[in-house]
Amino acid sequence: MADQNFLNEVSDRRTFAIISHPDAGKTTITEKLLLLGQLIQTAGSVKGRKGDKHATSDWMAMEKQRGISITSSVMQFPYKDRIVNLLDTPGHEDFSEDTYRTLTAVDSVLMIIDGAKGVEDRTIKLMDVCRLRDTPILTFINKMDRDIRDPIELLDEVEEVLKIAAAPITWPIGMSDFFKGVYNLYTDTIHVFVRGRGHTLMDDIRIEGLQSNEAKELLGDDWESYVDEIELVRGASHEFDHDAYLRGELTPVFFGTALSNFGVREMLDGFVEWAPAPIDRETNSRKVEAKEEKFSGFIFKIQANMDPKHRDRIAFMRVCSGTYSRGMKMRHCRIGKDIKVTDAVSFTAGDREGVEEAFSGDIIGLHNHGTIQIGDTFTEGEDLKFTGIPHFAPELFRRVRLKDPMKMKALQKGLQQLSEEGSTQLFMPQRNNELIVGAVGQLQYEVVAYRLKDEYKVECIYEAVNVNSARWVECDDAKKFEEFKNKCRDNLAIDGGGHLTYLAPTRVNLMMAEEKWPQVRFHSTREH
């Protein structure tokens, strides 16, 4: 029987990620959540108050320059007797693979929608990922103090485009310059909006009862029409159903303005009450329950140079069961080796501290000296492999050349380490000594060039290369596979993880190779 203190620790955990289209307000909301969790005293917007303050969660130099989240950082804070683990995901579409893997490490998701723009394409793609896993989703419609679209229209769009039932919990009173607050349909409470920059925690000004004299005074001549609007909303929208939310079929919806720190508290209150505690996880041999006492976890991300002073790499681990305690022994299942871990760390946006213990649902960082890969499983001895952590074939390819040929070793090391993070992939063709970098989008090339220069002191040049697509190859017939490798040597490369890859110059070439070698399997994704 598991220890009651341990069971309480697990059931108090809430581990989630935020998804949104770029510029919908994700970084601002992240900051306000940290403010509510009292991790920071004042919030600075991404662009900086008086130009001096960057968002706490955007801690890499290039992110500070561009104002988009490129890497996922992890923040833990206490709130209302719960321990909240927030994973910030990259806010740019070129980093979708990193985001996808981050979503495998959480139990629920907060979706931010820009009230002026509605559902945008990046949100649609991220929702598709959440739907694969039936992830529970809570929605915050942002920017109510601006000119926004009709709220009923926004709810309809969420339902039609994202194929999920929407249940409003709060409802806006006015919008833009006439925004007065939100009304909670379940507690019959008005939360009054006070204009100002939400850099600090505001008092929660409430009016109890839509029929109260205070409510009539706040709404003035609009009171009757607002009462009618609420009746219409109640009649036309879904009621909140907790089980449907946990199944990923219904999303509770909150309205507010993150910049002014309004509506975020109500949303967080709902989140800690309704979001699931750590869920059970599938492995290649059995389901691992979050409340099992034996420790297990998997690596969903690797980040190089989180601290340029230490030139290190950190592997981010989701704890799936049991307790991590400092100095414990754990089995690195892929290589079958037992290691003693004394220096695991936790993060708040670049500030790292040692972890004494961590429980199911927590995210910890392990120092990685090149032996840990994305998808690796760690246990207290049992041989397991957590499943469902994918690697996608890249869509763009560039040859990398050095400005200074003497720095080849540093270039190779830099590209190898950056590819281990999983947002770009390195390919080394068998026919020559070229280095080819594959990516999902153009921004990743800029990031790699910037980080090579900033962290490895290497300047590189990209050149066009005759590669259209990459496929991982495998074959059960050893003799046939040898024949394939000899005949197709000019198209074969080894990727950064040591896997054999077929680089096709055209789509037609790939189709012909697949026809000619039916025994060989060509994969566009592979499990880590």
Curated annotation (Swiss-Prot):
Superkingdom field: Bacteria
Keywords of this entry: Cytoplasm, GTP-binding, Nucleotide-binding, Protein biosynthesis
Species in which this protein is naturally found: Marinomonas sp. (strain MWYL1)
Gene Ontology process terms (BP): regulation of translational termination
Name of the protein this chain belongs to: Peptide chain release factor 3
A Pfam cross-reference name: EF-G_D2
Main location: cytoplasm
GO function terms (MF aspect): GTP binding; GTPase activity; guanosine tetraphosphate binding; translation release factor activity, codon nonspecific; translation release factor activity, codon specific
Residue ranges of every copy of the tr-type G domain listed in the record: 11-279
Family: Belongs to the TRAFAC class translation factor GTPase superfamily. Classic translation factor GTPase family. PrfC subfamily.
Keyword Cytoplasm appears in the UniProt entry: yes
Record localization: Cytoplasm
Residues binding GTP, per UniProt: 20-27, 88-92, 142-145
GO cellular component: cytosol
Functional description taken from the UniProt entry: Increases the formation of ribosomal termination complexes and stimulates activities of RF-1 and RF-2. It binds guanine nucleotides and has strong preference for UGA stop codons. It may interact directly with the ribosome. The stimulation of RF-1 and RF-2 is significantly reduced by GTP and GDP, but not by GMP.
Entries under SUPFAM superfamilies matching the protein: EF-G C-terminal domain-like (SSF54980), P-loop containing nucleoside triphosphate hydrolases (SSF52540), Translation proteins (SSF50447)
Regions that span the bilayer: none
